[in-house]
UniProtKB/Swiss-Prot annotation:
It comes from the Bacteria. GO terms for biological process: translation. GO terms for cellular component: cytoplasm; ribonucleoprotein complex; ribosome. It comes from Borrelia garinii subsp. bavariensis (strain ATCC BAA-2496 / DSM 23469 / PBi) (Borreliella bavariensis). This is Large ribosomal subunit protein bL21. This protein binds to 23S rRNA in the presence of protein L20. Keywords: Ribonucleoprotein, Ribosomal protein, RNA-binding, rRNA-binding. PANTHER family: 50S RIBOSOMAL PROTEIN L21, LARGE RIBOSOMAL SUBUNIT PROTEIN BL21M. Part of the 50S ribosomal subunit. Contacts protein L20. The lineage of its organism: Bacteria, Pseudomonadati, Spirochaetota, Spirochaetia, Spirochaetales. Belongs to the bacterial ribosomal protein bL21 family. GO terms for molecular function: rRNA binding; structural constituent of ribosome. The gene is rplU. The keyword Ribosomal protein applies. InterPro entries: bL21-like, bL21-like_sf, Ribosomal_bL21, Ribosomal_bL21_CS.
């Protein structure tokens, strides 16, 4: 059983009992998470599609931890001007465990 859920403007595939890597969430929301913006639910081949969301559906999750992703390096070089710029960035993600999908 899996569901497509919209979290902070992005869509994720949520499977019961598995971890979900989402963009970092605020510390206020970190105890027990419930998302009601479910776009699609697939249970044993039976598919329910929302318009835009599936009515009376909910995904319950548990917050686990925040981690940083690999560093992404941006490099800019301007020829013949003795000018270069190198910038690194590490995106922070939150890992949540999908406890159950209710519909």
């Amino acid at each position: 059983m899996y569901a497509l859920v919209e979290i902070n403007g992005k869509q994720y595939k949520a499977i019961e009992g598995e971890f979900l890597k989402i963009d970092k969430i605020s510390p206020i929301e970190k105890d027990k998470l419930e998302f009601n913006s479910v776009l699609l639910i697939n249970k044993d081949g039976e598919i329910k599609i929302g318009k835009p969301y599936v009515a009376n559906s909910l995904i319950r999750c548990t917050y686990k931890e925040d981690k940083k992703d690999k560093k992404v390096v941006s490099y800019r070089y301007r020829r013949r001007k003795s000018s270069e710029r190198k910038v690194g960035h590490r995106q922070t993600y939150s890992y949540i465990l999908v406890d159950e999908i209710v519909f």
